Structure formats: C-alpha cells, structure tokens
C-alpha cells in the first residue's frame, strides 16, 4: 500500500518543479516532462521514493531513533513545527545556527541558558528584578526560544534529519554529512540530490506539498514508535513467561528433592 495516492500528490502540487532555466541536471532522472517553461516531476518515482523514505524512517523510529525536522523558509515553518511536534520529535524552523550539529556542546550551553531564563520567568525571579533588566532578559529568552526552542529537549544529536529544501538548508545538510547523519529530504528540480541519502522528488515551495510530505514522515515515526512499544511489550511478556517457567522448574526440583528425602 502506498503512503500517499497519486491524487493527493496532484492536489498538493507536488509535481510542479522550477522553471526550466533554473534546474540541476542531476535531477533529470526524476523529471517527467516540461510544460510552459516549468519542469514536471515524475510522480510515479515520487510515490516509490516516498514509500522507501517512509519505511526507512519507520524502521529507525522503531529502534528508538531521534529525528530533527528542518525547514526555515516561510512556507515550511508551520508544517515543520507542527509535524515534528505531533511525532514527538524536534525541529528548526527559523534560522539555522551554524554549528547546531557540529558544535553541539556550545549549542547545549545556549539551550541550558534558555532553560535558566524560562525558570527565572516562571519562579518569580523576574518579579523582583528591575524592569530594565527584566526587559533585556526577556528579549534574550525570546531570541533563544525562537532559534533553539525546537531542539530544547533533544537528548542527543539526531539519528536522522528530514529537510524541506536542502538547497536553502545547505549548511544544515553539510553538518549532517560531516557527522554521518542520514538526510531525508524533499528535493526540487533546482537542487543537487547528491548530498541527500534518501531523496523524495517534490515541489518544496508549495505549502500543501510540504505539509503532505512532512505529515507522511511524522506518520512514519509515529507508526515506528508504536511498533517499538509493541515489541517492548512482547519482550516483556516473553521475559515474564521465561521467569515464570524458571520459577516453575525450581518448584518442581524442590518437590522432587523432598520426595527423594
């Protein structure tokens, strides 16, 4: 069963690429035709590659993987935040701060500062400070929240990064490549697909297209996590059963020993 239907892809405008004069030749295998100076993406390939991406993401989620959604362009900001949050994962939907992954220790110190400021705001510390100081601290907190709020609780460097428009997010993609973090991405006709590990050929400018693909990735994570929970339940049942059998064997041995006495 396919993750999304051809009808859904068409209605969301996933097939519309960029103008033919703005293209990357490496995307040629994913282009169906051109119409009125616009490349049309081959949706048969999109369906197949989206299915592959879904299964890959689901498998990583089932192993307890951590995911980072990245999309800072205006069209992507809401979908990236909402779908990452729905899947219980993390996101960057404002400016990507250089070193977010490659300088994780420094970023963690800024996250710690954000948490400190939030605590001060909540525990009444701001109420006893001068108004001017509170204004400065509030401004600092809001700035940190804007850029780091989506990764505030991320426990470690992600296992997989999902990207909307890797051409725009080239710094994020480069950092992931350096660290060997697999990148799953919506790749439009104007983008080099080589730095991407799992390519989803798609219009990365249309809000509906972004929401559809981001939603599919969130669904994959949720399904994978459900599978993880199920497997943990099975493992627990098997462990409990094994323990019960051990207890039963011990009881039998005791009975046998007593009968021999």
Swiss-Prot record:
Keywords: Ribonucleoprotein, Ribosomal protein. InterPro entries: Ribosomal_uS2, Ribosomal_uS2_bac/mit/plastid, Ribosomal_uS2_CS, Ribosomal_uS2_flav_dom_sf. GO terms for molecular function: structural constituent of ribosome. GO terms for biological process: translation. PROSITE patterns: RIBOSOMAL_S2_1, RIBOSOMAL_S2_2. Residues 223-261 are annotated as: Disordered. One of its GO terms (cellular component) is cytosolic small ribosomal subunit. HAMAP family: Ribosomal_uS2_B. Belongs to the universal ribosomal protein uS2 family. PANTHER family: 30S RIBOSOMAL PROTEIN S2 PROKARYOTIC AND ORGANELLAR, SMALL RIBOSOMAL SUBUNIT PROTEIN US2M. This is Small ribosomal subunit protein uS2.
């Amino acid at each position: 069963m396919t993750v999304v239907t051809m009808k859904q892809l068409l209605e969301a405008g996933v097939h519309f690429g960029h103008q033919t004069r703005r293209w990357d030749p490496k995307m040629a295998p994913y282009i169906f035709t051109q119409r009125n100076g616009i490349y049309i993406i081959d949706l048969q390939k999109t369906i197949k590659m989206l299915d592959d991406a879904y299964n890959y993401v689901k498998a990583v989620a089932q192993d307890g993987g951590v995911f980072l959604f990245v999309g800072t362009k205006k069209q992507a900001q809401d979908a990236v935040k909402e779908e990452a949050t729905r899947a219980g994962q993390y996101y960057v939907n404002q400016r990507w701060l250089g070193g977010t992954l490659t300088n994780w220790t420094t970023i963690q110190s800024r996250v710690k500062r954000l948490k400190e400021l939030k605590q001060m705001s909540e525990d009444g510390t701001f109420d006893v400070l001068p108004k001017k100081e509170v204004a400065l601290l509030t401004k600092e907190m809001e700035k940190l929240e804007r850029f780091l709020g989506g990764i505030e609780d991320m426990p470690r460097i992600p296992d997989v990064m999902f990207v909307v428009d890797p051409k725009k997010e080239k710094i994020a993609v480069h950092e992931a490549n350096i660290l060997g973090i697999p990148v799953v991405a919506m790749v439009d006709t104007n983008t080099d697909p080589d730095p991407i590990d799992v390519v989803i050929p798609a219009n990365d400018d249309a809000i509906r297209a972004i929401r559809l693909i981001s939603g599919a990735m969130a669904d994959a994570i949720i399904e994978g996590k459900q599978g993880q929970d199920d497997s943990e339940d099975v493992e627990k049942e098997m462990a409990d059963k094994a323990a019960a059998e051990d207890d039963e064997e011990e009881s039998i041995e005791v009975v046998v020993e007593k009968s021999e006495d």
